[in-house]
């Protein structure tokens, strides 16, 4: 079984998360996709809204039979993606995981704790976000792992590829942004 992992604060979840989830399921040929609603993001200053509220909102907006909304990071008590992946691979040794991220995350991926370990342990699917395509493609991670990039036309091979492997997809985009939603006051913690 192949499972895409979309980690994030989801503070709040929005239509952009739904859109990239549907695209990832199809284009990366995934059996399932799990939203890993994180208790907190080590790279962000302000804490997110309550876990209960974010999980509830995620379940309301993402209604798909192959998508699971999960609080497993809180239950595993992991803080960093590399730790979470290590624990998930122990818990589910039969599952082939693919880490999913927006292009905005690839642009600063080199700031993540043990980011090379992530690239070396699971395939990584990168989905375009408004305004972040060029910075992502020129990022440190993209340059270092350029020889391991799977062309978008072969994205269906990513989930079964040996690590390191990554693929950048241009997908239809929405301008939805959790940051902008919070700035407008449409979501408060």
UniProtKB/Swiss-Prot annotation:
Gene3D superfamilies in the cross-refs: HUPs
Origin superkingdom: Bacteria
Pathway linked to the protein: Cofactor biosynthesis; NAD(+) biosynthesis; deamido-NAD(+) from nicotinate D-ribonucleotide: step 1/1
The EC number(s) this enzyme carries: 2.7.7.18
GO BP annotations, alphabetical order: NAD biosynthetic process
Gene Ontology molecular function terms on file: ATP binding; nicotinate-nucleotide adenylyltransferase activity
Pfam families: CTP_transf_like (PF01467)
Enzyme class: transferase
Signal peptide feature range: none
SUPFAM superfamilies, per the entry: Nucleotidylyl transferase (SSF52374)
Catalytic activity: nicotinate beta-D-ribonucleotide + ATP + H(+) = deamido-NAD(+) + diphosphate
Keywords: ATP-binding, NAD, Nucleotide-binding, Nucleotidyltransferase, Pyridine nucleotide biosynthesis, Transferase
HAMAP family in UniProt: NaMN_adenylyltr (MF_00244)
Family under the similarity heading: Belongs to the NadD family.
Function, as annotated: Catalyzes the reversible adenylation of nicotinate mononucleotide (NaMN) to nicotinic acid adenine dinucleotide (NaAD).
Protein name in the entry: Probable nicotinate-nucleotide adenylyltransferase
Species of the source: Ruegeria sp. (strain TM1040)
Encoding gene, per UniProt annotation: nadD
């Amino acid at each position: 079984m192949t499972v895409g992992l979309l980690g994030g604060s989801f503070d709040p979840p929005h239509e952009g998360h739904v859109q990239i989830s549907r695209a990832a399921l199809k284009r990366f040929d995934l059996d399932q996709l799990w939203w890993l609603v994180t208790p907190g993001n080590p790279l962000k200053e302000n804490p997110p809204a309550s876990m209960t509220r974010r999980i509830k909102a995620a379940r309301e907006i993402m209604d798909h039979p192959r998508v699971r909304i999960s609080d497993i990071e809180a239950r595993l008590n992991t803080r960093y993606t590399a730790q979470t992946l290590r624990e998930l691979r122990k818990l589910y040794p039969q599952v082939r995981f693919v880490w999913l991220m927006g292009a905005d995350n690839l642009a600063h991926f080199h700031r993540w704790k043990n980011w090379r370990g992530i690239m070396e342990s699971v395939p990584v699917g990168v989905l375009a976000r408004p305004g972040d395509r060029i910075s992502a493609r020129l990022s440190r991670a993209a340059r270092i792992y350029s020889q391991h990039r799977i062309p978008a036309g072969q994205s269906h091979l990513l989930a079964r590829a040996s690590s390191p492997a990554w693929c950048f997809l241009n997908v239809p985009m929405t301008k939805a942004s959790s940051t902008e939603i919070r700035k407008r006051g449409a979501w408060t913690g």
